[in-house]
Amino acid sequence: MFLLYEYDIFWAFLIISIFIPILAFTISGFLAPINKGPEKLSSYESGIEPMGDAWLQFQIRYYMFALVFVVFDVETVFLYPWAMSFDVLGISVFIEALIFVLILIVGSVYAWRKGALEWS
């Protein structure tokens, strides 16, 4: 028999984690002052008047480097729970994690050879 009461803590945290940000945004919307003037609408740059254009173009190398970083950051998110419960899961999950890491290594070698990790 599948027992639903085991998930009560999960549902409580889920409801609370959805409710608190909604409540915070609602309260700040009611309490925030509404004064829109020319000074309020101007851009702020370290307390002085902005110099030059506000629009800046980044090079494509930055985006490639950031994308590779995000991929390996997500890898850490997936591997951390596996590492914490390694002794319980057994050898089959170890093989799956090994395949996952090997795919990521192949991807990093591919990105390296394509020059995505070079900044010059």
From Swiss-Prot:
Key words, A-Z: Chloroplast, Membrane, NAD, NADP, Plastid, Plastoquinone, Quinone, Thylakoid, Translocase, Transmembrane, Transmembrane helix, Transport
Top-level taxon of the source organism: Eukaryota
UniProt record, GO biological process: photosynthesis, light reaction
GO MF annotations in UniProt: NADH dehydrogenase (ubiquinone) activity; quinone binding
Membrane protein topology class: Multi-pass membrane protein
Cystine residue pairs: none
Reactions catalysed: a plastoquinone + NADH + (n+1) H(+)(in) = a plastoquinol + NAD(+) + n H(+)(out); a plastoquinone + NADPH + (n+1) H(+)(in) = a plastoquinol + NADP(+) + n H(+)(out)
GO terms under cellular component: chloroplast thylakoid membrane; NADH dehydrogenase complex
Thylakoid is among the record's keywords: yes
EC number: 7.1.1.-
Any Pfam family matching the protein: Oxidored_q4
Location (main, coarse): plastid
Enzyme class: translocase
Quaternary organization: NDH is composed of at least 16 different subunits, 5 of which are encoded in the nucleus.
Function according to Swiss-Prot or TrEMBL: NDH shuttles electrons from NAD(P)H:plastoquinone, via FMN and iron-sulfur (Fe-S) centers, to quinones in the photosynthetic chain and possibly in a chloroplast respiratory chain. The immediate electron acceptor for the enzyme in this species is believed to be plastoquinone. Couples the redox reaction to proton translocation, and thus conserves the redox energy in a proton gradient.
Family the UniProt entry places it in: Belongs to the complex I subunit 3 family.
Identification of the protein by name: NAD(P)H-quinone oxidoreductase subunit 3, chloroplastic
Organism placement in taxonomy: Eukaryota, Viridiplantae, Streptophyta, Embryophyta, Tracheophyta
